[in-house]
UniProtKB/Swiss-Prot annotation:
Belongs to the ABC transporter superfamily. The complex is composed of two ATP-binding proteins (LnrL) and two transmembrane proteins (LnrM and LnrN). The keyword Lyase does not apply. ATP binds at G34, P35, N36, G37, A38, G39, K40, S41. Keywords: ATP-binding, Nucleotide-binding, Translocase, Transport. It comes from the Bacteria. Its EC number is 7.6.2.-. Gene3D superfamilies: P-loop containing nucleotide triphosphate hydrolases. This is Linearmycin resistance ATP-binding protein LnrL. Coiled coil: none annotated. Required for resistance to linearmycins, a family of antibiotic-specialized metabolites produced by some streptomycetes. Part of the ABC transporter complex LnrLMN that probably facilitates linearmycin removal from the membrane. Responsible for energy coupling to the transport system. Also mediates KinC-dependent biofilm morphology. It holds the Pfam family ABC_tran. Residues 2-232 form the ABC transporter domain.
Amino acid sequence: MLQAENIKKAYGKKTIVKGISFSLKKGESFGLLGPNGAGKSTTISMISGLVPHDSGNITVGGYVIGKETAKAKQKIGIVPQEIALYPTLTAHENLMFWGKMYGLTHGEAKKRAAEVLEYVGLTERAKDKIETFSGGMKRRINIGAALMHKPELLIMDEPTVGIDPQSRNHILETVKQLNETGMTVIYTSHYMEEVEFLCDRIGIIDQGEMIAIGTKTDLCSRLGGDTIIQLTVSGINEAFLVAIRSLAHVNDVTVHELELKIDISAAHHEKVVTSLLAEATAHHINLLSLQVQEPNLERLFLNLTGRTLRD
């Protein structure tokens, strides 16, 4: 569905995107992550044909961006981070406008607008002006506008920013359903749990480069760091600490009062937990609580991009 090969973009002397490559199969859901200023928005703008790429090749649905951009755009629906709606028009009028912008006839746009309003759960508000809508409702119509021409590739740039939990849940379920019908999705967000819920594969961009790409399971197992076991115990003695520090697959043990944080190799936590229980029994120590924190997407992201704030 999408092929991006070594695409680059510079503004003046500053290179924003430094040769990114990736491809998507039809029906795949792809999460694109990165810190602020990493090059995510520029990348999706080039893919969608809104910003010309300086070099490299982009193909969408068999059409080459830069040569057959108009045909490629017919395959693409874009949900921008900003609300791209006219506030003084009704929800139905906004959808009709976007339908005609995509080349639908009046009849086609009217039929499709009714379908889209039902899809985003706003049929009853069709005749209300956008300026009367909540932030979450505007976001849902924003998505609806991108669906008017039945795109094969849906590009979503942080579509749940600043909305209520109910609207957020509705949007996520809508995206999931669209993907299950065969629509290809590129989804950018700073909410890691959304990407984990929606996406088959994940790409992480930093400083204009794709620094990691793969499934969540693959990336976390390779790059996500250690599994952490947190213990709260009734008491601690030196012999117990020596014993657990010498266990196979234990990389580090830190102690704070009666709490222990044990970093272990991710693939072996079941063996280590069994050994910990045995050592606690042998040293007459009662375990008050035990929690296992496996590598997750947020830890992976911070491991790769660092914890320094980005403007």
